Regions:
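Single conserved hydrophobic/aromatic residue that forms the stacking wall/gate
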Residues: 1-9, 14
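Short glycine/threonine-rich catalytic loop with a Thr-x-Gly-x-Asp
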Residues: 10-11, 160-161, 223-232, 302-309, ...
């Protein structure tokens, strides 16, 4: 079988599309997925006056030459912000170009506290003023032209770093961001901005230097394949089926992901920029050199992305051996393991951050059942578990999966899965 991993993650597309607010000229972005989070963000940009042209599937041109700042202050816009976490990414480009931004506390995944301090403190250091309306739950941000400065971020926040970068590119003078996130998502945003005329150096490191320019111009950009989707399909192929090829994965941007799966005993074979995951009747978890059982934990890039821990946990349920999954960066992403325990998985939830998985070594199949998807990544993990389980499973709240995976049921059905979308 072959499945083409040529799509992108919602976060990356959202940041890149917001960067189009920094210029009045057209910016063309290719490889945009048809997923709900991205579609909602594009509609939000259209609502504020950005002209969006769909050239072909996944190929859009954005032109922000008639942005309606009055709409940005409207209750309708602010109500939209509460339902879409990506709305916070409008702050950086809007305050940089227009000197004004308003945003309500955004929505998104229910995976614990996701504070906005890094965004706000960084943009404040550039000279912006923040007023918070407690009654409406709205931030009113305003500034003259921002001024470059040195800042040491309190956390290597991906969205916070992106927002500060976009605010800095039009600031006077030089901005230095230390402890910046350096994920491929951030690298690609910086490359896009440089093609638009920005002056950003230190890309791929945690120390970025941004020399402000007077204006940006149009550019063309192709977004990277989504490494989380690639990892999800690796996990799926390990659990069930006769093996798959995943095409055009941008291997050099996968980081530690293939190695992490290999520590669970999963074979990930590279052929150029493609991956092949063979059929796995058996796979065994490594142990550390001193004989202690394996621990997998998330960390800021180039460490393991937290978005794949849910998938790795499910894969471990059918491995031979024991692994500790340690979710350090969020505090509520492991609660979905109760549903896996109901399916017959051997998991001990130690606390909100740690779970011990004792694998079945493919000797005992999971049982199908009813479950609810709490967030994007737990949703795809439960779907993988259901595909490998004995019997029929029913997953509700699949809108969460739709937020991050394009046409997931039709793509998996093409690989031989039996998945049907039903109305409840």
């Amino acid at each position: 079988y072959e499945i083409c991993a040529c799509l992108v993650g919602s976060e990356m597309c959202i940041r890149d599309s917001c960067a189009t607010l920094l210029t009045s000229e057209p910016v063309r972005i290719k490889n945009i997925p048809d997923i709900s989070d991205v579609n909602n963000q594009i509609r939000l940009l259209e609502d504020v006056g950005v002209k969006v042209t769909r050239n072909a599937p996944g190929d859009f041109t954005f032109q922000a030459d008639e942005v309606n700042m009055e709409y940005v202050q409207s209750d309708e816009f602010l109500a939209r912000c509460t339902k879409l976490r990506g709305s916070v990414m409008l702050i950086g480009p809007m305050i940089a170009r227009f000197g004004r931004a308003m945003v309500a506390k955004p929505g998104g995944d229910k995976i614990g506290r996701r504070r906005l301090d890094t965004h706000f403190l960084g943009i404040q250091k550039l000279g912006a003023k923040f007023d918070y309306d407690i009654r409406r739950g709205v931030y009113d941000i305003h500034a003259g032209r921002l001024c470059g400065t040195y800042m040491l971020l309190d956390e290597a926040s991906v969205t916070g770093t992106a927002n500060i970068i976009m605010a800095s590119v039009l600031a006077m003078g030089t901005t230095t961001i230390y402890n910046a996130a350096c994920e491929p998502y951030i690298q690609q945003l910086c490359h896009l901005l440089n093609r638009m005329g920005a002056n950003i150096s230190g890309i791929a490191s945690n120390l970025l230097t941004i020399v402000g320019v007077d204006s940006l111009h149009g550019a063309a950009h192709t977004v990277l394949p989504d490494m989380i989707e690639v990892g999800s399909f690796i996990g799926m192929a390990a659990m069930v089926g006769d093996g798959i090829s995943i095409k055009n994965v941008s291997y050099d941007n996968l980081g530690i992901i293939p190695y992490t799966f290999s520590r669970l005993g999963v074979q990930v074979l590279r052929h150029g920029d493609d991956l092949f995951i063979p059929r796995h009747d058996h796979y065994e978890i490594d142990s550390f050199l001193d004989g202690s059982f394996m621990t997998l934990s998330d960390a800021p890039w180039p460490g393991l992305t937290p978005d794949l821990l849910s998938v790795l946990l499910v894969v471990a349920t059918q491995a031979k051996g024991t692994v500790l999954i340690h979710q350090k960066m969020f505090e509520s992403r492991l609660f979905f393991v109760d549903k896996l325990i109901d399916m017959g998985a051997q998991i001990i939830l130690c606390d909100p951050h740690r779970a011990v998985v004792v694998g079945h070594d493919h000797q005992i199949r999971l049982r199908g059942g009813r479950m609810t998807s709490p967030d994007i990544r737990a949703g795809i993990a439960l779907l993988i578990a259901a595909m490998s389980a004995d019997g029929t499973s029913r997953i509700s709240n699949i809108e969460q999966i739709d937020r991050g995976y394009e046409n997931i049921e039709s793509r998996l059905t093409a690989l031989g899965a039996c998945i049907k979308r039903v109305e409840e």
